[in-house]
C-alpha cells in the first residue's frame, strides 16, 4: 500500500533541504499517516483506514459518511 491518505488522497511532497551555506538537496516530505479504526454507524461496524492527521480532525467534525461521499469511497469494500 502506498503512503497515501485513503480519504483526502494526500501523499508525499518533493522539496528542497537548504543548508546554512545554501546548498540545496532534494528531500521528501511525508504525510503524517495513522491507522485509525472509525465507527461506521450505517454499517454498524468499525472501518480501519489509513488517514492523515488532518483528515482525522476533519472526520471528527464532518463524520465518516460525509467524508467518504466526498471522496467517492464505498465503505462496504473496506
Curated annotation (Swiss-Prot):
Name of the coding gene: rpmB
Keyword presence, tRNA processing: no
Coiled-coil ranges (or none): none
Region (Disordered): 1-23
Listed NCBIfam families: L28 (TIGR00009)
Superkingdom: Bacteria
A GO molecular function held by the record: structural constituent of ribosome
Cellular compartments per GO CC: ribonucleoprotein complex; ribosome
Alphabetical list of Gene3D superfamilies matching this protein: Ribosomal protein L28/L24
GO biological process, one term: translation
Keywords, ordered alphabetically: Ribonucleoprotein, Ribosomal protein
Cited SUPFAM superfamilies: L28p-like (SSF143800)
Family listed: Belongs to the bacterial ribosomal protein bL28 family.
Protein name: Large ribosomal subunit protein bL28
Amino acid at each position: 500500500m502506498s503512503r497515501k491518505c485513503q480519504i483526502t488522497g494526500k501523499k508525499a511532497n518533493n522539496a528542497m533541504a537548504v543548508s546554512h551555506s545554501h546548498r540545496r538537496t532534494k528531500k521528501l516530505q511525508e504525510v503524517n499517516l495513522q491507522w485509525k479504526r472509525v465507527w461506521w454507524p450505517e454499517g454498524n461496524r468499525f472501518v480501519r483506514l489509513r488517514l492523515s492527521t488532518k483528515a482525522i480532525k476533519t472526520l471528527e467534525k464532518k463524520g465518516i459518511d460525509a467524508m467518504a461521499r466526498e471522496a467517492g469511497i464505498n465503505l462496504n469494500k473496506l
